[in-house]
């Protein structure tokens, strides 16, 4: 790699990387893959978190990832599987839970508790006769699929205002229609830009004065904290590196935020993707990472920068989070059906 001799200081954003929901989900997969290895290999429905490195490391431990539970039958013919499936951190529609139970699978539901809270609200408001406007960035995002699946007949997908037109399945907040404007509530994907979500809610509130807006706490604390950390560092740096998968919604929002504040912001997933031209003319650099990015990848980038820039000053900026979530308990097929 070419010289990066102009770089003098790196600011590492705190918090960055794994949030409590991701830690809980990954630890659950690792622990149960080990605990069940005598019975067979573990299956996870959907990527446990949206990070290729995490998925590859778990695959190396014999964990299988499927996008359709029907794939479990095929895998059973080829491999010795444990009769257990882990649901990823993003949440899933009731139909998937029922399917797992009907297949006789024990379920470990590693859905983030903050996502579960939004699911609970969707069910409650639908039962009370409200129309739900669900703000998201893509109808294909697993979290949107899961929340929508709780009340599909009363939910309308709405694009966060910065993504209008990018996915035709998401309505424009400025023109969206609901059958009863007197009974309408807004819910949101938890990993969006805080500022963009609040701006979208403001647009909807103008359109529907009776709009019910649940607590701002529905926006994930980790998403908010990581965005605030980028805002704090931005005035001190000339460029930003964001370690994230392109499939991580919270990571891509960090990248967009850094680009809007600094102008020069670059995405990478692994240290070896670092490119010298990104840092030409840069003396101060900010680094952050998505809530599903392992910390050793960040440190790998820092090590490369130090090797290229002797005397490089590395500043940890901000505070770490202290929140932790309890690991899920296994649910029998009967217990899953009761709650589906």
Curated annotation (Swiss-Prot):
<dbReference type="InterPro" id="IPR003451">
    <property type="entry name" value="LytB/IspH"/>
</dbReference>
<dbReference type="Pfam" id="PF02401">
    <property type="entry name" value="LYTB"/>
</dbReference>
<dbReference type="GO" id="GO:0050992">
    <property type="term" value="P:dimethylallyl diphosphate biosynthetic process"/>
</dbReference>
<feature type="binding site">
    <location>
        <position position="50"/>
    </location>
    <ligand>
        <name>(2E)-4-hydroxy-3-methylbut-2-enyl diphosphate</name>
    </ligand>
</feature>
<dbReference type="GO" id="GO:0019288">
    <property type="term" value="P:isopentenyl diphosphate biosynthetic process, methylerythritol 4-phosphate pathway"/>
</dbReference>
<keyword id="KW-0560">Oxidoreductase</keyword>
<dbReference type="GO" id="GO:0016114">
    <property type="term" value="P:terpenoid biosynthetic process"/>
</dbReference>
<dbReference type="GO" id="GO:0046872">
    <property type="term" value="F:metal ion binding"/>
</dbReference>
<feature type="binding site">
    <location>
        <position position="249"/>
    </location>
    <ligand>
        <name>(2E)-4-hydroxy-3-methylbut-2-enyl diphosphate</name>
    </ligand>
</feature>
<feature type="binding site">
    <location>
        <position position="250"/>
    </location>
    <ligand>
        <name>dimethylallyl diphosphate</name>
    </ligand>
</feature>
<comment type="similarity">
    <text>Belongs to the IspH family.</text>
</comment>
<keyword id="KW-0479">Metal-binding</keyword>
<protein>
    <recommendedName>
        <fullName>4-hydroxy-3-methylbut-2-enyl diphosphate reductase</fullName>
        <ecNumber>1.17.7.4</ecNumber>
    </recommendedName>
</protein>
<dbReference type="GO" id="GO:0051745">
    <property type="term" value="F:4-hydroxy-3-methylbut-2-enyl diphosphate reductase activity"/>
</dbReference>
<feature type="binding site">
    <location>
        <position position="50"/>
    </location>
    <ligand>
        <name>isopentenyl diphosphate</name>
    </ligand>
</feature>
<feature type="binding site">
    <location>
        <position position="248"/>
    </location>
    <ligand>
        <name>dimethylallyl diphosphate</name>
    </ligand>
</feature>
<feature type="binding site">
    <location>
        <position position="249"/>
    </location>
    <ligand>
        <name>isopentenyl diphosphate</name>
    </ligand>
</feature>
<comment type="pathway">
    <text>Isoprenoid biosynthesis; dimethylallyl diphosphate biosynthesis; dimethylallyl diphosphate from (2E)-4-hydroxy-3-methylbutenyl diphosphate: step 1/1.</text>
</comment>
<feature type="binding site">
    <location>
        <position position="19"/>
    </location>
    <ligand>
        <name>[4Fe-4S] cluster</name>
    </ligand>
</feature>
<feature type="binding site">
    <location>
        <position position="292"/>
    </location>
    <ligand>
        <name>dimethylallyl diphosphate</name>
    </ligand>
</feature>
<keyword id="KW-0411">Iron-sulfur</keyword>
<dbReference type="GO" id="GO:0051539">
    <property type="term" value="F:4 iron, 4 sulfur cluster binding"/>
</dbReference>
<keyword id="KW-0408">Iron</keyword>
<feature type="binding site">
    <location>
        <position position="90"/>
    </location>
    <ligand>
        <name>(2E)-4-hydroxy-3-methylbut-2-enyl diphosphate</name>
    </ligand>
</feature>
<feature type="binding site">
    <location>
        <position position="292"/>
    </location>
    <ligand>
        <name>isopentenyl diphosphate</name>
    </ligand>
</feature>
<feature type="binding site">
    <location>
        <position position="141"/>
    </location>
    <ligand>
        <name>isopentenyl diphosphate</name>
    </ligand>
</feature>
<feature type="binding site">
    <location>
        <position position="250"/>
    </location>
    <ligand>
        <name>(2E)-4-hydroxy-3-methylbut-2-enyl diphosphate</name>
    </ligand>
</feature>
<feature type="binding site">
    <location>
        <position position="90"/>
    </location>
    <ligand>
        <name>dimethylallyl diphosphate</name>
    </ligand>
</feature>
<feature type="binding site">
    <location>
        <position position="249"/>
    </location>
    <ligand>
        <name>dimethylallyl diphosphate</name>
    </ligand>
</feature>
<feature type="binding site">
    <location>
        <position position="292"/>
    </location>
    <ligand>
        <name>(2E)-4-hydroxy-3-methylbut-2-enyl diphosphate</name>
    </ligand>
</feature>
<feature type="binding site">
    <location>
        <position position="248"/>
    </location>
    <ligand>
        <name>isopentenyl diphosphate</name>
    </ligand>
</feature>
<feature type="binding site">
    <location>
        <position position="141"/>
    </location>
    <ligand>
        <name>dimethylallyl diphosphate</name>
    </ligand>
</feature>
<feature type="binding site">
    <location>
        <position position="141"/>
    </location>
    <ligand>
        <name>(2E)-4-hydroxy-3-methylbut-2-enyl diphosphate</name>
    </ligand>
</feature>
<feature type="binding site">
    <location>
        <position position="112"/>
    </location>
    <ligand>
        <name>[4Fe-4S] cluster</name>
    </ligand>
</feature>
<feature type="binding site">
    <location>
        <position position="190"/>
    </location>
    <ligand>
        <name>(2E)-4-hydroxy-3-methylbut-2-enyl diphosphate</name>
    </ligand>
</feature>
<feature type="binding site">
    <location>
        <position position="50"/>
    </location>
    <ligand>
        <name>dimethylallyl diphosphate</name>
    </ligand>
</feature>
<feature type="binding site">
    <location>
        <position position="250"/>
    </location>
    <ligand>
        <name>isopentenyl diphosphate</name>
    </ligand>
</feature>
<keyword id="KW-0004">4Fe-4S</keyword>
<feature type="active site" description="Proton donor">
    <location>
        <position position="143"/>
    </location>
</feature>
<keyword id="KW-0414">Isoprene biosynthesis</keyword>
<comment type="pathway">
    <text>Isoprenoid biosynthesis; isopentenyl diphosphate biosynthesis via DXP pathway; isopentenyl diphosphate from 1-deoxy-D-xylulose 5-phosphate: step 6/6.</text>
</comment>
<feature type="binding site">
    <location>
        <position position="248"/>
    </location>
    <ligand>
        <name>(2E)-4-hydroxy-3-methylbut-2-enyl diphosphate</name>
    </ligand>
</feature>
């Amino acid at each position: 790699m070419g010289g990066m001799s102009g770089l003098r200081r790196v600011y590492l954003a705190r918090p960055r990387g794994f949030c409590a929901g991701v830690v809980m989900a990954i630890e659950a997969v690792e622990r149960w893959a080990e605990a069940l290895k005598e019975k067979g290999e573990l299956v996870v429905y959907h990527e446990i978190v949206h990070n290729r490195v995490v998925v590859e490391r778990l695959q190396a431990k014999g964990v299988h990832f499927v996008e359709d539970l029907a794939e479990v039958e095929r895998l059973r013919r080829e491999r010795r599987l444990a009769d257990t499936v882990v649901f990823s951190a993003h949440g899933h529609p009731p139909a998937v839970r029922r399917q797992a139970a009907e297949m006789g699978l024990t379920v470990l539901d590693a859905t983030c508790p903050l996502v579960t809270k939004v699911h609970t609200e969707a069910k409650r408001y639908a039962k009370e006769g409200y129309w739900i406007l669900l703000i998201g960035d893509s109808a294909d995002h697993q979290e949107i699929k899961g929340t929508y699946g709780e009340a599909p007949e009363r939910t309308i997908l709405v694009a966060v205002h910065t993504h209008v037109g990018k996915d035709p399945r998401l309505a424009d907040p400025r023109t969206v229609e609901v059958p009863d404007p007197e009974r309408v509530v807004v819910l949101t994907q938890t990993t969006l830009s805080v500022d963009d979500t609040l701006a979208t809610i403001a647009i909807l509130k103008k359109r529907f004065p009776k709009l019910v807006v649940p607590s701002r706490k529905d926006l994930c604390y980790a998403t908010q904290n990581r965005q605030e950390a980028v805002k704090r560092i931005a005035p001190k740096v000339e460029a930003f590196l964001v370690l994230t998968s392109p499939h991580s919604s919270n990571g891509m929002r960090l990248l967009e935020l850094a680009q809007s504040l600094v102008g020069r912001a670059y995405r990478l997933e692994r240290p070896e993707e670092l490119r010298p031209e990104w840092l030409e003319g840069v003396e101060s650099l900010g680094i952050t990472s998505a809530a599903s990015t392992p910390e050793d990848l960040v440190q790998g980038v820092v090590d490369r920068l130090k090797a290229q820039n002797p005397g490089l000053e590395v500043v940890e900026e901000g505070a770490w989070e202290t929140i932790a979530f309890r690991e899920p308990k296994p649910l029998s097929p009967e217990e899953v059906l009761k709650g589906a």
